[in-house]
Amino acid sequence: MSLDIITPPATTPISRAELKTHLRVDTTAEDDYIDTVILAATDYFQQRSWRQLITATYGLYLDEFPTDYIEFPKAPLQSITSIVYEDTNGSTQTWSSSLYEVDVKADVGRLRPIDGESFPGTDTVYNAVTITFKAGYGDAATDVPDLVRSTIKLIGAYFYENRQNILTTGSVSEIPVPMALGHLINQFSLREFV
């Protein structure tokens, strides 16, 4: 299984003005850096929680369909755009949405064939199945839960005050944060994918 972002979010869960107010910064000298901090804090939260905060479109690639159901590695799942696969003859097919059902209410979105149906057979190639889906709380920052937005501000403040951590770490998700921030993130974490 692999995951690729197709259409990134159009905005961030907090604005520059919100983080500047939180930081008590009233100059414009560091606006570009603050924008970078917002992106890093958002990325950190999303990587650690397996959640997508603002609506984005993803491609999920599978070598074959499972036998029972598919769980989506980004939540909350909004919708399935398409399911395309290579059939056993090597031809590209689109699986009709009338043949499967989607659970967008569960913490981890799921998809399975409707009763009486089964997943189609696939060719024995890598990434034979491509599922395009949308995930996120919504299109606007105000759609994101307030506790998540507050957590992003706290992570952003930590990154702002500890700049060397952002510059010396290979991956945003490897940056150490205070234990309290880790606990806030864990409240939203989808542990099945960690």
Protein language model features and the residues they cover:
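Divalent metal-cofactor coordination and adjacent catalytic microenvironments
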Residues: 1-194
